[in-house]
Amino acid sequence: MIFEGKEYEFPIVVGTENEKAINIEKLRALTGLITLDSGYKNTGSCKSAVTFLDGERGILRYRGYNIEELAAKAEFLEVAYLLIFGELPTAEEYDDFKRTIHKYTLVHEDMRHIMDGFPRSAHPMGVLASATSALTAFNPVPVNVNCPKHVYQAVCKAIAKVTIIASWVYRKREGLPLNYYDNKKGYIENILRLFFEIPTEEYKINPTIVSALNKLLILHGDHEQNCSTSTVRLVGSSEAGLFASISSGVSALWGRLHGGANQAVIEMLEEIHADGGGVDKFINKAKDKNDPFRLMGFGHRVYKNFDPRAKIIKVAADDVLNALGIDDPIFGIAKHLEKVALEDEYFKSRNLYPNVDFYSGIIYKALGMHLEMFTVLFAIGRLPGWIAQWKEMRQGGEPIGRPRQIYVGATERPFVELNKR
């Protein structure tokens, strides 16, 4: 690099998948310059061994394992262990992991009073973020990141308690009594009964639904340095506690452009249905650069190819609709929209393929979830990724995150007394 007649050299960092980056840690010290990269499109904030994503080739791997293989063969808690601890668990390790999570599924009864304080009309993600942060009050001892046993207990506690709290958010909204974990059942089966079981009836587990939800949560497990994950790492870099950091991730995930996208997909489909169900009209609106309408659930900030997660969850979505025998015009519109967009040269040339949000929203709606609850399920899936990234950041000794800026406000000016303004 040449600046003001001087030449500067900066090292190239190469990742294990041959990704290359310019290390500019000494840029300001040497030149007085900083870089400006709105939205961090070209900025790597860290080195990470958790997730590899190649948007050009449509590749997603957790700790080296292809997402397609994990979704087909693994259980969600196996993948959670993999993300957090770096390796797939042995049978003995996996049994202990599940037992320890079971041990922590009871939530302090005072949390019920906190939940009672939220109005039923409150947005579920706001309640989840607040309640997750409140868990800090019941777990005040900071996690000793240098003690493997302490970290392990904190990880299991976070997975257990945030899952329970998420179900309470749903049940409060629906006016149902709060539910508790059944240690005789698996994790995915428990999520379904925690949310949907009612006291007067036996909840029957549908294996097709269990399989689809297991896949969906695995696909949501981690996605490199996205908005919510980067938020968790940034908040955690101040040595904020695990629950506080997770709560910040929940808040970031809440946004319509991040985790809220699956809700936006269903809202779009309902808008099309209310207009008469004519897909072509809305396809043309999406093509019109002067029209504010945006086709939700298509394209991705990172993937320039088909989202590998979408291929998997499309099959699961079809399985769920068939298993439940649902005849909803919304799903017919979704299939028509998908077909038209996949065949239309406008969308093909711009790599606007259906993404994971397009299909996940369909599954959540088929399960009977209220629109505003979709992102709560997303948060349960993303929880292991947040924990893994927080753990990696804390144990890696990363400095506190402190981005810089280019100031574009007023230059120095004198204060004007009130009576002279």
List each language-model region with its residue ranges.
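Non-transmembrane, aqueous-exposed alpha-helical and coiled segments at domain scale
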Residues: 1-421
